[in-house]
Regions:
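Sec-exported extracytoplasmic/periplasmic mature domains
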Residues: 75-79, 135-136, 175, 179-186, ...
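Active-site beta->alpha N-cap acidic-glycine motif
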Residues: 3, 8-143, 147-153, 157-158, ...
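Second-shell loop/turn segments in exported
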Residues: 50-61, 154-168, 274-278, 311-314, ...
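Extracytoplasmic/secreted proteins, especially bacterial periplasmic and envelope-associated proteins
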Residues: 42, 65-69, 126-129, 165, ...
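Short secondary-structure transition/capping segments
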Residues: 94-97, 154-157, 230-238, 311, ...
Length: 429
């Protein structure tokens, strides 16, 4: 790993620990999906930043593109993945390459896939055959941004990077790739990972606001496949072998310690060069899949993993599972970390999110952010509920619920989230 990345990661940890308050999670329409709750040996793999029309590096696959090598390997093991594709980085200039082995290896101001001055070999815009192959073989394709420009500032590691100027620019960029996939392939991309997983944006917006608008879920991962990290070995072959080991051994050790370790997990992979312009994933993916197969795992796209359970803390053994799943499809009941926290008391803000129409909630929050540059997570829903007499004018979003509107709920004297969701009249959906 380059020293810049090491320093950036350590600095971020220190800031989070000493300065940044603990992250708060709120009920919303978009949640960050890193894993799901299941006892079955089923998991998912995501492949960021492709498709890549250049060969693997080093090329020991007769000139086949890296993406073809990955698809061949997945097919060999009966596995299918989620490919987080970009559109085209050809407009990301003027720019220059940074130091090899650093986070800026492919561009100081922008990302370039698969490499700087090779943009015409990357992305969905230039790789029609690869996109069609992904779809024909049952893989999922998700929206990783048309130009793969980060949504906001990221001072650690990417301090010199250009970022999108705000909410509208992010929506425009995602819509461009969304439309390309719809018009060219008749394919709709519901989940999405933001470029470099940057969430905070200018004007008080976040990636969650953008995905609310797009109707996406935020797709992330719980286990790093590690193919993007460069080895510090000076000899190229020794470096490649070290990178392959760094991808395979953590998975092997995790499975030896706990054979159920990967149940419901999402494993992050790279469909492109690492920071040293090598592609260890081309060599290590087969070893990883062989390990998972040895332990009886099925590897599926994230969309199919979500069919197992859409939640991180609730599975099919929960008596309310079907009700909760139906509610989550039309109402905001899940926290941003994809947890339900069923046995905690419900707050007034969470009740407002359950009752208010999605369009009203999102529109009001966006309008408030445009107007004054700040808005609470529940402000849009609270405003609608107050106007419709469902919560009192004096109620604060953090107050615990002590009564429920009779037209919306069957009688209950308990106000945990579990009991409130159980009492909700489903004919109000």
């Amino acid at each position: 790993m380059s020293w810049i990345v090491k320093v950036g990661k350590q600095g971020k940890k220190i800031v989070k620990k000493l300065i940044t308050p603990a992250e708060k999670h709120y009920v919303g329409y978009t949640r960050r999906i890193e894993r799901v709750h299941t006892t079955r040996r089923i998991c998912a793999m995501t492949f960021d930043d492709g498709p890549m029309g250049l060969p693997a590096s080093p090329d020991r696959f007769d000139g086949r593109t890296l993406t073809d090598v990955l698809l061949d390997t997945l097919a060999q093991y009966g596995a299918r993945g989620s490919f987080d594709v970009i559109g085209d980085t050809s407009a990301n200039y003027p720019d220059e390459a940074g130091k090899l082995g650093s986070a800026a290896w492919g561009g100081v101001r922008f990302d370039h896939y698969p490499d700087i001055h090779c943009d015409e070999q990357g992305g969905a815009e230039h790789n029609d055959r690869l996109i069609r192959r992904m779809l024909a073989e049952g893989h999922q394709i998700t929206n990783h941004g048309y130009r793969h420009i980060i949504f906001g500032k990221k001072p650690f590691v990417y301090g010199a990077r250009e970022y999108l100027p705000g909410f509208d620019a992010a929506v425009e960029d995602l819509t461009r790739l969304h439309t390309l996939m719809q018009t060219r392939y008749g394919y709709t991309m519901p989940p999405a990972p933001p470029p470099h997983y940057v969430d905070k944006m200018t004007g008080g917006f976040t990636s969650y606001d953008v995905y609310d608008h797009m109707g996406y879920q935020y797709m992330a991962a719980s286990f790093d496949g590690a193919g993007w990290l460069p080895s510090t070995e000076s000899d190229p072959e020794a470096a490649l072998q070290a990178e392959i080991r760094a991808m395979v051994e953590p998975m092997r050790k995790a499975l030896e310690k706990d054979p159920d370790f990967f149940c419901g997990q999402i494993i992050f992979q790279k469909d492109g060069y690492n920071m040293a312009k090598r592609t260890p994933v081309a060599f290590a993916l087969g070893e990883q899949l062989a390990l998972l197969q040895e332990y009886g795992y099925q590897v599926v796209p994230v969309g199919e993993l979500l069919a197992e359970s859409p939640f991180a803390d609730v599975g099919r053994d929960e008596p309310l599972f079907d009700r909760l799943t139906a509610l989550a499809q039309q109402r905001a009941i899940v926290f941003s970390d994809n947890r339900l926290r069923l046995d905690d008391p419900m707050t007034v803000g969470e009740l407002a999110m359950l009752l208010a129409p999605k369009a009203e909630t999102i529109t009001r929050r966006v309008a408030q952010l445009r107007r004054i540059g700040r808005a609470g997570a529940y402000d849009g829903a609270m405003a609608w509920c107050r106007e419709n007499g469902l919560v009192s004018e004096a109620a604060h979003p953090a107050d615990h619920v002590t009564a429920l509107p009779e037209a919306w709920f069957v009688p209950t004297d308990s106000f945990t989230r579990r009991d409130v969701y159980a009492a909700f009249r489903m004919d109000r959906l």
